[in-house]
Curated annotation (Swiss-Prot):
SUPFAM superfamilies linked to this entry: Family A G protein-coupled receptor-like
Region listing for Disordered, in residue ranges: 152-292, 1089-1108, 1244-1268, 1315-1343, 1482-1555, 1638-1704
Protein name, per record: Latrophilin Cirl
GO cellular component: plasma membrane
GO-annotated molecular function: carbohydrate binding; G protein-coupled receptor activity; mechanoreceptor activity
UniProt topological domain (Cytoplasmic) ranges: 793-805, 854-879, 946-972, 1022-1724
SMART domains, sorted: GPS
Major localization listed first in the record, in broad terms: membrane
């Protein structure tokens, strides 16, 4: 059979020029010759061929060769090391030779053994011999993995094969004096010309064989096998094409990781893998021909056994048929193993002196690529060791039951070599399987022990002698342990034949001594190769049999002894102690062994006295102790699991060797667990696992103290033949010892993990890019978390101090700790002192962070199910509870974990995770899952409740709060999912990277992405999306000059208002200390809505306003910003520079946190807050008369003085009905005296909500809707003057309905200014009394108390306060007495303006029961002070607590108007009131709502309903009122009063916002009905749109228009109907203005008079406006000729502007959970 080769030449330019030339060559035959001792060995070749010796030995390796008589006593481990040298000197390169096999020629390596001479050789041609050195060459299949190539027609150049796999050494072998070193093999430097695939020469290189001389991975070295094998250095004949020099290349050995499935000796044909680290450098290729497993021996002359991995493939590389690959021939266990096809099992007879068969399997192993191996580099040699099959090998193929395949072309090989280039055949397992090989002499002993008359003592002695002197095989181990157990069973029956007790004890003791000696021999190092002949399952089975056999024989002796005695059997590897103790002599624990008995180890086992007493029998306790040496090398643990199922995979998972040439490879090694202590045993019953009530204590010394961790206490399970942890626990451990506690008795030891000697942190797993990305990701997240925390702390004035703010602060703190600890932990190694601390704190931080997320979801749920939806205030008790449960529970869990097993935090490979054990899942995974599921559950419930509420609530504050809660729930849910993704990716990445999984990289980059997104999410959705935070950022940036110029660029935005006043104890002082200016942008705030074209004109118009010269900007609006150029600017300077849009004089904007941030001196003053949007408080005092345009009546309200005394050239028209307002630039601007307060928010048009009254001719819409508007978002709170009711007799219709305007229309009356004069006199008296008070503190205290009483009196609806007493004491007593007489109505809200001051039924309705006006009768003693206490639905108010600042006492008692008209009104109003309130802020619960509905159902039907008069009906009114109608009205009045009393009796709770829609409808109906009745009583038309029948001068009585809360303008709406009436009578001075038209009174009729002036201001007005001066003018003149207005009116206006002071607006939360606001009194 011929082989085809290719000849390739390489040009000077290194271009490959190959000419294929087929030549035939006869492959040399591999031959073996033997010669017995005393005879000649003759070697002869054919003519033309020369002898090439491969290996030789003089001695004996086989018991069958040259043994005609079957002598089994000869040694089979006999070798003369210089046999090959002697034979080469006689036969090398000769055609024939003869050598005498005698001791005189070779020496006597083993006297007493019949020896033989064995030689392996080839007959090669003389031409081949001329190109090589005199070194012997190996067989052709050893020379190369590729076809031979002829260079230049001579010299055979072999294609260098890749390094074959490094076979792993046998694990767990530890010598008694340390680690056994492997004898190094010979290394020969040589040069070679490497040939690449395709015939291209790579160049001349040199390589030196290096064999391992030590271990660098911390594992035990390969075991020493006492087998004599031939050692030969295989050389490759090479020749350089350029220089012609030749050399021999000695192949290096490469050790690989053996991984795969299937146990040793298995025939399953499993594909295994091996890890290869080829030693390749550019331009240099080492020619490798074999892979060696070096096994040293302890006998004379150590040898090395070589395993040649040869791929016998006729086609070379390139075939897809794995059956074409072969394992090379080798020697192992005194047998020659010829080449075997992959997947086949080589079976042959056992070595000489043993019966049975031996087998060894050839498998295909995958070479795992590493850093030095390029899988796709075609310029490198093919990673295979396939060679063509020589013709002479056909017989070998047949001998191995395999067939030889025909050749295939080289081109096919090159195209197909990629598939199998990473695979190569390997013998598996590490050693042949000799389980069925049994020595002949052991068979003889087994037959003897089964005989009836055999002597057990003799058999035991023979067995101990044979095992100490003979080499055993795997089958011999099984037979030996079986004989030991058989002898114990037989002795159990034979001992009864010995009647004498002493004789019985002596015989059993002798038997026990032989058994112990035999067991020690089996554990000896010399028999380690016999253990390796067994597969792992059989090894565990033999070890279990040995332990049980020793225990059975020991208990034979213990049961024989009947008195207290201690028998100790001590041999080389076993210490056995049999103790029989009397219970009465046991005074403490029993300790084994004694310090002087077992010097090999300091292990100790301690049995408590209670455990011994419980297991006593007949007053005696029988104990068997045993300590073993070298048993730890046999009872190897399986990978990760200590049971029989995984024992099969131990070899492939634990035999890990690093490449000797590259000890610092970056490949991750798999987990290795070793037995790191001696095995110690204790038993109280033969073969029984006795459970003890009190555990025993074991102290075990570590065999290896470096690079080991995770000690685990285990015992040997006889049933599973594996180590188990059941019943044992680790008490404590240190570097050298571990203390264990077990509740049963058996064989104990310590298992530990092997750690790589080169400690690596977690970042060693990362590639360069991932390491950088992790740093960047963590840094980004940390920066954004810090920004969020600083935002919450620095801008705390923006936020409500609520539970949600505290929760998010805690979440940010926990996340910051997690990020920093993770960054520190991944840089630490397991040996670092900070490793355990970092893991502990990280555990606590993760648990706390997850708990806070759960509490955040719970808080959202509780907010939706309680009144907290409308009142988001500081909830300190609840937050403290969250703190306790979060941090307290986390610390408790971590403390429990530390108490159970502290080493859990230090046993993991890296310092960011706990060890994955039961404690990890119980204390880490379980709490996190509980918190996570709870958070998801509460979020789901919150979403359901929110959806249900959104369908049942009005578009009021509750609806807005629901929208805010909905947004918070969404953000929190996304936040929770994102954080869970971050932690899950981090966990799976760490676990995967630890096991070197490919998917770990994917998890790593997912962690980087999610962690970065987490930081961005925190910054965007928790900081940037909040409008107030954005505004604070802009302020902060523009106020700090150290920031970059690009960040502090100036922008323009709308002004949010200014503070009026020039100093004073109110807002003005604070305003003067504040900083910043405002500019204008497009906005919808209730300010001037002029366009840009009129900005300059209005700025010039504001120059002459004295009261605003020193006004300072109080705070920026939602879009306002502080100008960087002028950080402190007054209103006047802002108007002059053009950066400030003119605004109403005296308007104040109090924004969220403004007062707090500007250092308000008043305690507790803070502006209302909101979770979204901006809230503004407008203080429209002394508002300037602006140019009025259509749609601006809401903002620019005409004032009383400008109406009464118009400026020259100025005419006032209302509702744009032919009258213009023309204020000259230089003229004094009129001002309005009454005050308007309201909260409002800038309108959002994109919500698609209809603006009320936006059509032409109607009242323009407010920016954000008005009171209880049904078509707009009711988002404002109004504070307006609620005029006190007046009671008295019914006046004739001719009486003036507007007494305030009467003095202007009819100067002789001057009722208003006469009242002012009376109030001034009373005020002077009061000042004299106040001066007698001791101090200002007492004044403030008494005043506050009196004001509180007056406030309760006003809300209780009782009678009016009496006239002021002469001194304060009497005044206070009378107030207290009157308070006791009043009946407090608990259902009052702050908007209950229609409640009567008295509840008596005897007083009828006079002039309307709900009309409010200022002042009372002269003798009624009622107060006329303004009360600013109306708060309606404000969807942004969070209901903070405010300090109370009420009015001055003087103002309360001097602010009455004594007219008979209002005396009669007081009596009329006292009889009834409005039943409903539309402005309650009380959220109300479900129970209260149900009660209210039930109570309403129980109410009888009302007989008094509103008349169905159409608002648009223009029929004339019949002046005659029938008696039936009057009776009907009287009955209705009584019914109304009765219903009010019924409400008081039942104690109805405050109305809830959920009933707002129904209440508003009922209010409209009730108001309409009352209005119609009042019209009948006053003789006025019932139709709203009817024109007034009275003259312009003789004003009719007030029509009793009530305050309606309806916001509609259509039919049924009081406001809409009355607006029509006002529009039709705009020029009529008799037009009436109800309080509900406070913000729309510019459309018709004159404005309200000054109702809020203090006595000082009123006295000034009286001085300026005397009755004599006012007499000269008339109402007609005032209206028709404004140019003739008296000068003192203008002077009074200017003086009034200069003296006006800004005041605080305070609020408090009353007993009905209603926020009530008050105006601060002016300074005395």
């Amino acid at each position: 059979m011929g082989l085809h080769f290719y000849e390739c030449n390489l040009s000077v330019q290194r271009k490959r020029v190959c000419s294929l030339e087929k030549r035939q060559m006869k492959a040399p035959k591999y031959q073996t010759a033997y010669a017995c001792e005393g005879k000649k060995l003759t070697i002869e070749c054919e003519p033309g061929d020369l002898i090439n010796l491969i290996r030789a030995n003089y001695g004996r390796f086989s018991i069958t060769i040259c043994n005609d008589h079957g002598n089994v006593e000869w040694s089979v481990n006999c070798m003369f090391p210089k046999s090959l040298t002697v034979l080469n000197s006689k036969c090398s390169h000769k055609q024939s030779c003869s050598v005498l096999a005698a001791t005189s020629m070779f020496g006597d390596p083993c006297p007493g053994t019949h020896k033989y001479l064995e030689a392996h050789y080839q007959c090669i041609s003389a031409a081949q011999t001329s190109t090589t050195t005199n070194r012997p060459s190996p067989p052709p299949w050893v020379l190369s993995n590729g076809p031979p190539i002829f260079g230049n027609g001579s010299g055979l150049i072999q294609a260098p094969p890749p390094p074959p796999p490094r076979l792993p050494s046998l694990p767990g072998v530890v010598g008694i004096h340390g680690i056994n070193a492997v004898p190094p093999t010979h290394s020969t430097p040589s040069s070679s010309t490497a040939t690449l695939p395709g015939g291209r020469l790579k160049g001349v290189t040199s390589a030196t064989t290096k064999h391992p001389g030590g271990r660098h991975d911390g594992l035990p070295p390969p075991p020493q096998l006492h087998h004599h094998h031939h050692h030969t250095d295989e050389t490759v004949p090479t020749k350089s094409s350029s220089s012609g020099s030749t050399g021999n290349v000695t192949s290096p050995s490469n050790t690989r990781i053996l991984t795969g499935v299937g146990g040793a000796g298995s025939d399953d044909g499993t594909l295994l893998t091996t890890k290869s680290s080829p030693n390749r450098t550019p331009g240099t290729v080492a020619s490798t021909t074999n892979s060696s497993l070096s096994i040293g021996g302890t006998g004379a002359g150590g040898v090395v056994r070589t395993i040649n991995n040869i791929n016998l493939n006729a086609a070379g590389m390139g075939t897809d048929d794995e059956s074409k690959l072969f394992c090379g021939p080798t020697h192992a266990r005194n047998l020659f193993w010829n080449m075997t096809r992959v997947g086949d099992v080589n079976v042959q007879p056992c070595p000489g002196g043993a019966a049975g068969i031996a087998k060894w399997r050839c498998v295909l192993m995958k070479r795992l690529p590493d850093a030095g191996y390029d899988e796709y580099d075609d310029d490198l040699p093919v990673a295979s060791s396939t060679t063509p099959i020589p013709p002479s090998s056909a017989g070998d193929c047949l001998h191995n039951s395999s067939s030889c395949e025909p050749p295939v072309s080289m081109a096919h090989k090159v195209n197909q070599n990629q598939r199998l280039r990473n695979f190569e055949p390997t013998w598996h397992p590490l050693t042949p399987d000799l389980t069925q090989c049994r020595s002949l002499w052991l068979n003889s002993l087994e037959m003897r022990v089964n005989q009836r008359d055999s002597s057990l003592i003799s058999i035991a002695n023979d067995l101990s002698e044979v095992t100490s002197s003979k080499t055993l095989y795997g089958g011999d181990m099984l037979v030996t342990t079986k004989i030991i157990q058989t002898m114990s069973e037989k002795m159990l029956h034979d001992k009864e034949t010995f009647p004498d007790q002493r004789q019985r004890e002596a015989i059993i003791m002798e038997l026990l001594h032989g058994v112990v000696k035999t067991g020690s021999n089996l554990l000896d190092e010399s028999q380690l190769s016999s253990w390796l002949d067994l597969n792992p399952e059989d090894q565990m089975r033999v070890a279990t049999s040995l332990l049980t056999g020793l225990e059975y024989n020991a208990f034979l002796l213990a049961d024989t002894i009947i008195r207290e005695r201690n028998v100790v059997q001590k041999v080389k590897n076993i210490l056995l102690s049999v103790r029989v103790l009397e219970t009465k002599t046991i005074h403490g624990s029993v300790v084994f062994p004694d310090s002087d008995q077992w010097p090999l180890s300091s292990d100790r086992i301690e049995l408590p006295r209670s455990a011994l007493i419980e297991n006593s029998e007949g007053g005696l306790v029988r104990i068997v102790f045993a300590a073993f040496d070298r048993l730890e090398s046999i009872l190897k643990p399986s990978y990760d699991h200590f049971d029989l199922k995984s024992a099969r995979s131990y070899v492939r998972n634990t035999a890990i060797l690093s490449n000797d040439s590259d000890a610092a490879t970056g490949d991750m090694q798999q987990r290795i667990r070793i037995l790191n202590s001696k095995v110690i045993s204790a038993s109280l019953g033969k073969g029984r696992h006795i459970q003890l009530s009190h555990p025993i204590t074991l102290v075990l010394k570590h065999l290896k103290t470096e690079n080991v961790s995770n000690p685990t206490c285990v015992f040997w399970n006889y049933i599973d033949h594996a180590w188990s942890v059941n019943g044992c626990s680790l008490e404590s451990t240190n570097r050298t010892h571990s203390v264990c506690s077990c509740n049963h008795l058996t064989n104990f030891a310590i298992l530990m993990d092997v750690v790589d000697e080169h400690q690596h942190s977690l970042f060693t797993m990362f590639d360069g890019n991932m390491r950088i990305f992790i740093y960047i990701s963590v840094a980004i997240c940390v920066v954004f978390i810090i920004i969020a925390l600083l935002t919450l702390k620095l801008f705390n004035g923006v936020f409500v101090k609520s539970a949600r703010t505290s929760i998010y602060s805690s979440i940010y703190i926990c996340l910051l700790a997690i990020e920093l600890l993770f960054l520190l932990g991944i840089e630490q190694t397991e040996t670092s002192i900070f490793c355990g601390f970092i893991t502990i704190f990280l555990h606590c931080a993760i648990l706390s962070g997850t708990a806070w997320f759960c509490y955040e979801a719970f808080h959202s749920y509780s907010t939706l199910t309680s009144d907290e939806l409308l009142l988001e205030v500081d909830q300190t008790p609840k937050v403290n509870c969250y703190y306790l449960w979060s941090y307290g529970l986390s610390l408790t869990v971590v403390a429990i974990s530390l108490a159970i097993n502290p080493s859990t935090y230090t046993q993991n490979d890296y310092c960011v995770l706990m060890e994955a054990n039961a404690l990890f899942y119980a204390t880490f995974v379980a709490p996190i899952l509980i918190f996570f599921v709870a958070a998801i559950g509460y979020t789901f419930l919150s979403w359901i409740i929110m959806r249900r509420k959104s369908r049942t609530t009005l578009k009021t504050k509750e609806h807005t709060r629901l929208a805010n809660v909905r947004f918070d729930i969404r953000c929190s849910f996304v936040f929770l999912l994102l954080l869970s993704a971050v932690w899950c990716c981090a966990y799976f990445y760490l676990r995967g990277a630890k096991l070197d999984e490919e998917v770990a990289t994917v998890y790593g980059y997912c962690f980087i992405c999610f962690n970065t997104m987490l930081g961005l999410y925190i910054f965007v959705f928790h900081c940037i999306q909040n409008e107030k935070i954005r505004r604070e950022y802009r302020k902060y940036v523009r106020q700090h000059a150290w920031l970059p110029k690009c960040l502090r660029c100036s922008k323009t935005s709308i002004s949010s208002g200014v503070v009026a006043g020039n100093g004073g104890p109110g807002v003005g002082n604070v305003a003067n200390n504040s900083a910043g200016t405002l500019s204008k942008s497009k906005s919808k705030l209730p300010l001037s809505a002029t366009d840009e074209a009129r900005a300059v004109e209005q700025q010039q118009q504001q120059k002459d306003v004295p009261a605003a010269d020193d006004a300072i900007i109080m705070g920026a609006g939602s879009d306002s910003e502080l100008n960087e150029a002028q950080q402190r600017r007054t209103l006047k300077s802002g108007l002059l520079t053009g950066s400030l849009q003119p605004t109403p004089v005296g308007a104040v904007v109090l924004e969220r946190g403004t007062l707090r941030s500007t250092g308000m001196a008043s305690v507790g003053h803070a502006s209302p807050t909101s979770s979204a949007g901006s809230t503004h408080l407008i203080f429209a005092h002394k508002q300037q008369q602006q140019l009025q345009q259509p749609g601006e009546a809401y903002y620019h309200q005409p004032d009383y003085y400008s109406w009464k005394h118009p400026q020259a050239g100025q005419r006032e028209y209302y509702n744009n009905t032919g009258v213009t307002a023309n204020a000259g630039i230089g003229g004094a601007s009129p001002s309005q005296a009454h005050e308007v307060f309201y909260w409002t928010q800038k309108h959002n048009n994109q919500h698609g909500k209809k603006k009320r009254g936006g059509n032409a001719g109607a009242v323009p819409a407010s920016p954000s809707g008005s009171l209880h508007s049904r078509v707009t978002a009711a988002s404002q709170v109004l504070f307006y003057p609620s005029y006190k009711k007046t009671s008295g007799l019914k006046q004739p219709p001719a009486t003036q309905a507007y007494p305030h305007y009467a003095e202007a229309l009819d100067p002789p009356n001057a009722a208003y200014y006469q009242q002012q004069l009376q109030q001034q006199q009373l005020r002077q008296q009061r000042q004299q009394q106040q001066q007698q008070l001791s101090s200002d503190e007492e004044q403030a205290e008494q005043h506050a108390h009196l004001l509180h009483l007056q406030h309760q009196q006003r809300r209780a609806g009782g009678p009016q306060l009496p006239a002021p007493p002469p001194h304060m004491a009497q005044y206070q007593q009378e107030l207290l007495a009157q308070q006791q007489r009043q009946q407090y109505r608990n259902k009052h809200s702050n908007c209950d303006l229609s409640q009567g001051m008295g509840l008596g039924k005897g007083m009828g309705m006079v002039l309307g029961d709900a009309y409010y006006n200022q002042g009372g009768s002269s003798n009624g003693g009622g107060d006329g002070g303004p009360v600013y206490e109306e708060i309606l639905s404000n969807r942004n108010s969070d209901g903070q607590h405010y300090e109370v600042g009420d009015f001055d006492v003087d103002e309360v008692y001097n602010n009455s108007v004594g007219t008979g008209v209002f005396n009669s009104m007081r009596a009329a109003v006292a009889a009834g009131g409005n039943r409903y309130c539309g402005g309650s802020l009380s959220g109300g619960s479900v129970t209260s709502r149900n009660q209210q509905q039930q109570q309403k159902q129980k109410q009888p039907p009302r007989r008094c309903v509103a008349d169905d008069d159409d608002d648009d009906d223009d029929d004339e009114y019949d002046d005659e009122v029938t008696a039936a109608e009057q009776l009907h009205d009287s009955v209705c009045d009584d019914e109304d009063n009765d219903s009010d009393i019924d409400d008081d009796t039942h104690g109805l709770p405050p109305q809830s916002d959920e009933r707002m829609r129904r209440l508003m409808a009922l209010q409209d109906e009730d108001f309409k009905r009352r209005f119609q009745r009042q019209q009948r009583k006053n003789g006025l038309p019932l139709d709203y749109g009817a024109s007034a029948q009275t003259a312009s001068i003789n004003h009719p009585e007030h029509n009793g228009a009530v305050f309606g809360v309806s916001g509609g303008v259509g039919e049924g709406s009081m406001r809409g109907a009355y607006r029509q009436q006002q529009q039709q009578n705009a020029k009529s001075p008799s037009a009436r203005l109800a309080v509900n038209e406070l913000f729309g009174h510019g459309n018709a009729g004159p404005p309200l008079p000054p109702a809020n002036q203090t006595p000082a201001q009123k006295r000034q007005q009286l001085q300026k406006l005397s009755p004599q001066s006012t007499t000269s003018s008339s109402s007609h003149t005032s209206h028709s000729n404004p140019q003739h207005a008296p000068a003192h009116h203008i002077q009074h206006q200017q003086h009034h502007q200069q003296q006006q002071q800004a005041r605080h607006l305070s609020a408090m939360l009353d007993e009905n959970n209603t926020v009530r606001c008050y105006l601060e009194p002016l300074a005395k």
